[in-house]
Amino acid sequence: MKPWIWTLLMATALASCGEPPLMAVSKEVSMDGWFSEERLLFHWDVQDTLQRQDLLLDIRHDQTYPYSNLYVFLTYRYPNGRSRMDTVECTLANERGEWRGSGFGDLVDHRFLLQSGIQFPLRGRYGLEVRHGMRHDPIPAVANIGLRLEAHQGDSRP
């Protein structure tokens, strides 16, 4: 193989390797359905209160998921015992019904930016409780819900 081709391949491989997440956890959801009272709990520890981070929600479902979106209720829990609630609409399909995420086989993966460039104000253990906020209960075909914490990359995210 010519040296310049090898160099190009190595440069491409290295460029595609991103920084690993600070935390990545995925919770499995029963394929029998996700009931609204089923709360998925995520925890992580923060020591550096100056580092800017991005908080992302991962959703994996199969092709039979019957809706174009998924509403989730989020409860953030802080080390000092306080909490904050939020509601997020995750758009999973476009107007034509085509999934916006990527997938392999029957599964489709989506990643949603919940908070960008946040600085956690306190050292200690944080938590996030996730439950669905859809009208129908249970909702079918959701396989996993995940949470990722990554070093903030500036304005490079969509």
Language-model features: locations:
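Sec-dependent signal peptide recognition
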Residues: 2-9
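C-terminal motif of bacterial Sec signal peptides marking the signal peptidase cleavage site
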Residues: 13-16
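Bacterial signal peptide processing site
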Residues: 18-21
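Post-signal-peptide N-terminal segment of Sec-exported extracytoplasmic proteins
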Residues: 38-67
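Noncatalytic modules at the cell exterior or secretory-pathway interfaces
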Residues: 50-57, 118-134
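Short acidic/polar inter-strand loop motif in beta-rich domains
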Residues: 63-64, 109-119, 131-142
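Exposed low-complexity, polar/acidic, P/S/T/G-rich flexible segments that act as propeptides
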Residues: 72-77, 135-158
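An anionic, turn-rich surface loop/hairpin at beta-sheet edges
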Residues: 88-119
